[in-house]
Amino acid sequence: MELKGKVINFLGDSITEGMGTTACEKIYHQIIKEKYDMEHAYNYGISGTRIARQIIPTKDFTKHDLTFELRADIMDKNADAVVVFGGTNDYGHGDVPFGEIDSEDVYTFCGAVNSLIKKLKKDFPNKKIIFMTPLHRLNEEEPSEPDSKTLKDYAAVIVEICKKHNVGVIDLFKINPLDPNDKELVPDGLHPSDKGHRVMAEVIAEKLLEI
């Protein structure tokens, strides 16, 4: 897709919000905006949020329960595209089952992805909808959710569900642009640094141009 002059909504969690960066303009989507002369790159990232609903509400961190689908209503409806970047918090601290690939039960991860895609297609008809799979992270093979799925399982099912719905995917998990053990790029093993966001931006922009 052409990026120049475009408006893109970026819906995500702490990485999209910019945790780990030193300034807003250092976030991957703002880097892309400036480099490719986009009109707007709207930041709809909220730290700690998940794609799926939570069975037991999160104490003290209630904003974590503002799922992607709940927040989709506030996004700019005139955008040319929506980029969804999530799943790592569903893996990291979600309490719902992984679910079945054809489910629309938002109290499962698979169901919530299906439901989110359905909503985005309704709200943004004839617009580009693109999902990005989670980046590699430390403890990605130490699941806490009830079905003991690894982060690799989450990434794989996002790809599979998106293919089913004919939705674009940037498979960052497969591309693996950032080593979570590299302290310069990912200091805490999860949130990229300014330099990490620059690396991400290059990869994401290249893939967006191909979609």
Predicted stretch roles:
Residues F10, E17, F173-P177:
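Short alpha-helical interface patches
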Residues E2-N9, I15-Y107, G111:
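Conserved SGNH/GDSL esterase-like catalytic core that processes O-acyl groups on lipids
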Residues H64-I211:
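Alpha-helical cap/lid subdomain in secreted, periplasmic
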